[in-house]
């Protein structure tokens, strides 16, 4: 069951990965250190616009020909949906619409906040993935795992390996879990221990609200 779920996830993550994107535009900047024949420029305080999203940072190396840029310092991605992503560093490809964010990454989607040190975010599918540890805080619920997949559209999160869900009423440990930030319901797909205030429960398939 778990293999089928994550095979499905990876197939979704690759959808449109190589679709040709529109050209990245510069909305504003403090300084542009000349475009060379290669189309490369160093930009200070840039605000980029790409297919409805704005991407800002302290500085960026922009390759207009390749339709990519590398951004440094106080990176902020704001999407039309209202979701905002912060980080210290960003590599963005306008052709695939893939954003690779590193160092102090924070994704805020309404009342759900995801933090990690490395996040790959697909601006087309609106799916974010981490494989080096991450945390999602949703109200009073806190979820941590080694690997995580956040689906902005459905607000579903899939967690894999060393998964821990901490809620006011219980501590849950498992290796595979799905959680919805709107309903706050957790779904288990493998060996799971639920430690309540008065008892402990073991299960391999079920839900927790």
Identify the function of each model-found stretch.
Residues 20-209:
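N-terminal amphipathic/hydrophobic interface segments
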């Amino acid at each position: 069951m778990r293999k089928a779920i994550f095979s499905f996830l990876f197939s979704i993550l690759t959808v449109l990965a190589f679709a040709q994107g529109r050209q990245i535009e510069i909305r504003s900047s403090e300084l542009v250190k000349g475009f060379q024949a290669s189309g490369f420029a160093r930009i200070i305080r840039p605000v980029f616009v790409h297919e409805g999203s704005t991407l800002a940072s302290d500085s960026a190396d922009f390759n207009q020909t390749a339709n990519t840029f590398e951004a440094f310092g106080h990176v902020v991605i704001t999407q039309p949906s209202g979701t905002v992503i912060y980080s210290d560093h960003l590599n963005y490809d306008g052709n695939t619409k893939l954003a690779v964010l590193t160092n102090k990454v924070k994704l805020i989607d309404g009342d759900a906040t995801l933090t990690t040190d490395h996040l790959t975010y697909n601006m087309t599918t609106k799916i974010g993935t981490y494989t080096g540890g991450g945390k999602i805080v949703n109200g009073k619920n806190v979820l941590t795992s080694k690997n995580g997949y956040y689906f902005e559209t459905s607000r579903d999160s899939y967690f894999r390996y060393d998964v821990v869900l901490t809620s006011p009423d219980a501590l849950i440990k498992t290796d595979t879990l799905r959680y919805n930030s709107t309903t706050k319901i957790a779904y288990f797909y493998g060996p799971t221990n639920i430690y309540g205030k008065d008892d402990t429960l073991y299960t391999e398939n079920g839900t927790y609200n």
